[in-house]
Amino acid sequence: SMGVQSFEASTLTKLGRGHDGDTAVRAFEAARAAGFDNVSMDFIYGVQGQTVEQVRRDAEAAAALGSEHLSAYALTLDAESLAEEVPLARQLARGEVTLPPDDVVVAMQRVVRDVYRQAGLERYEVSNYARPGFHSRHNSAYWTGGDWLALGVGATGSVGQARYANVRSAEKYLVEVEAGKLPEQSRETLSALERFEERVAMGLRLASGLDLEATCAAFGQPFDARRPFVERLVAEGLAVREGRRLRLTDEGLDVHSAISARLM
């Protein structure tokens, strides 16, 4: 999996990345030459100063390389999750970052979707596209409520009701491990409501959706109170019911966060 982010020099500069587009292409070609037949690339859109046309060029260039899996994420900025030494973090702290308006970001998302779909890549999750048989098995654990282990500096893990994160200092991580200790920085136990909210938000990211009635029942939440909103989503073309499953349409996936918040 390659964190390309963009082939455009101006976008990479804004993100504080040290590579350029040609370097990313050469890295992809090197992976192919080494025998890798499953290469994934990640991209970011919604960057300050970025245009819809630049996003289109990125998507077309990525599709032309023939990658089996492509991810495209809208940029979100969280000062707490950005390392202090990252240029973007310093700019954010100084109030120098202005992201594109929401309607432009949605237009970027739709351009990516259309370009990838024309190239034979299926949108199987809000931000992820793949050729048949190449869906991300790792990320599916996040979207379907599975467990995963935190291995490495700053990694996060989830086992049952517990969520935990490792220390973000490599030096401290090594000290803890060599002392036979778990290098955890924090741990919390999620309530049934928190797990329900997470399950709904993550499950609706998938193009296949989720069984909302069963999810409500599993976590003690009333489905009937949500039924009118579900019916409204279907009537407005933002979702469809397939048996017991509720899945969002392309238009619904574009506003996934707002829909999930209402259902929670």
Locate predicted features.
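Minor-groove-contacting beta-hairpin "wing" of winged helix-turn-helix DNA-binding domains
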Residues: 245-249
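Short, amphipathic alpha-helical interaction segments positioned at domain boundaries
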Residues: 251-264
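C-terminal scaffold of the Radical SAM
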Residues: 1-221
